[in-house]
Amino acid sequence: MNIYAVGGAIRDELLGVPVQDRDYVVVGATPEQMVAQGYRPVGKDFPVFLHPQTHEEYALARTERKTAAGYHGFQFFYAPDVTLEEDLARRDLTINAMAREVRPDGELTGPVIDPFNGQGDVQARVFRHVSDAFLEDPVRILRIARFAARFVDFTVAPETLALMRKMVADGEVDALVAERVWQEVSRGLMEKKPSRMFEVLRECGALARILPEIDALFGVLQRADYHPEVDTGVHVMMVVDHAAQQGYALQVRFAALAHDLGKATTPEDMLPRHIGHEGRSVDLLKPLCERLRVPNDCRDLAVLVAREHGNIHRVMEMGAAALVRLLERSDAIRKPARFAEALQACEADARGRLGFERREYPQAERLRVALVAARGVDAGAVAKRLADAPAGIKDALHQERVRAVELAIS
């Protein structure tokens, strides 16, 4: 029995970036031998075991072949005579198809085992497929795009890009299940430069298949005085990248991505203005979230930002009454943390424009001050005072908040 560390750990070691976790492959063993040594079986489709001390995953070396469409359509074969090279050959990219032997004490030993020149592609900063078996799994398109958002100086090899385009043309991408699309897109949004993910998906044609609402934004004109970058798709990518640079949470980054969807459906005779795009954005966003089964926290924040970002940008012109209406409409008094995230997304929107990257955004502070004042009003006291006339509680509470905000912003 020989144990090897494989894949991302070897790649990251060569790149000089922190190794988050390791994947292990065991060559020359049977499931019974693994159990006899104290490993606990956990794999459903193929034998994966948890180490008795570290609880890290160890998989028996295996091969696979395509049996049906989509990323579920695989049959796996494992046996003690499956070699390390055969196991590495089934992997997606050369940079993920390297290994090093593991000593009994857990330390790596010996040279990098690299049958597909992954080290050369790490040095050249290239994503290159291992073999034409790459064509068999459409998830690999999403993975390459996600890797592009993490390793921003890498490019896709022309021959690999050609295979990705073929997979799109053959309809393989259409077989992807919603949960897997969201899993990869959400992980890509959390990488260093999410725009690279969408750039790669556009290059191979996959973006139009899995996120047509985003793909449709590219080439849509905006007013150059507000948006020197002009192209709506370019603007949205700048917004998402700004949110990533600030380290914002996933729901903020998704809201940044989806805030301007309605600009793609602006009537041509209205361009480059986009009057009413906020409502159209919400109309497109809700079915998108349903289709991809986007988590509720991401969906709810994205809908709020899509609907209100134009109003939030204009709060410097608003008086106390309008500010309170905005806060109440946004449920900010009950959910201040969510509203704080909405302000992050709106600030990213304002700064995600050519030449505006470092521009101040006083709107956020004005709304923070207003929210503190509005939340300071004792709703219970108002309700108690109007116990005999409960129909008037809502309006009275609103007026109290307006007075409190008026004092706070004056």
Swiss-Prot record:
Its EC number is 2.7.7.72, 3.1.3.-, 3.1.4.-. Keywords: ATP-binding, Hydrolase, Magnesium, Metal-binding, Multifunctional enzyme, Nickel, Nucleotide-binding, Nucleotidyltransferase, RNA repair, RNA-binding, Transferase, tRNA processing. Its cofactor is Mg(2+); Ni(2+). CTP binds at G8, R11, R91, R143, R146. It comes from the Bacteria. Magnesium is required for nucleotidyltransferase activity. The keyword Disulfide bond does not apply. One of its GO terms (biological process) is tRNA 3'-terminal CCA addition. It catalyses: a tRNA precursor + 2 CTP + ATP = a tRNA with a 3' CCA end + 3 diphosphate; a tRNA with a 3' CCA end + 2 CTP + ATP = a tRNA with a 3' CCACCA end + 3 diphosphate. ATP binds at G8, R11, R91, R143, R146. InterPro entries: CCA_bact, HD_domain, NT_sf, PolA_pol_head_dom, PolyA_RNA-bd, tRNA_CCA-adding_enzyme. Mg(2+) binds at D21, D23. Pfam families: HD, PolyA_pol, PolyA_pol_RNAbd. One of its GO terms (molecular function) is magnesium ion binding. Residues 232-333 form the HD domain. Monomer. Can also form homodimers and oligomers. A single active site specifically recognizes both ATP and CTP and is responsible for their addition. Belongs to the tRNA nucleotidyltransferase/poly(A) polymerase family. Bacterial CCA-adding enzyme type 1 subfamily. Catalyzes the addition and repair of the essential 3'-terminal CCA sequence in tRNAs without using a nucleic acid template. Adds these three nucleotides in the order of C, C, and A to the tRNA nucleotide-73, using CTP and ATP as substrates and producing inorganic pyrophosphate. tRNA 3'-terminal CCA addition is required both for tRNA processing and repair. Also involved in tRNA surveillance by mediating tandem CCA addition to generate a CCACCA at the 3' terminus of unstable tRNAs. While stable tRNAs receive only 3'-terminal CCA, unstable tRNAs are marked with CCACCA and rapidly degraded. PANTHER family: MULTIFUNCTIONAL CCA PROTEIN. Comprises two domains: an N-terminal domain containing the nucleotidyltransferase activity and a C-terminal HD domain associated with both phosphodiesterase and phosphatase activities. This is Multifunctional CCA protein. It comes from Paraburkholderia phytofirmans (strain DSM 17436 / LMG 22146 / PsJN) (Burkholderia phytofirmans). The gene is cca.
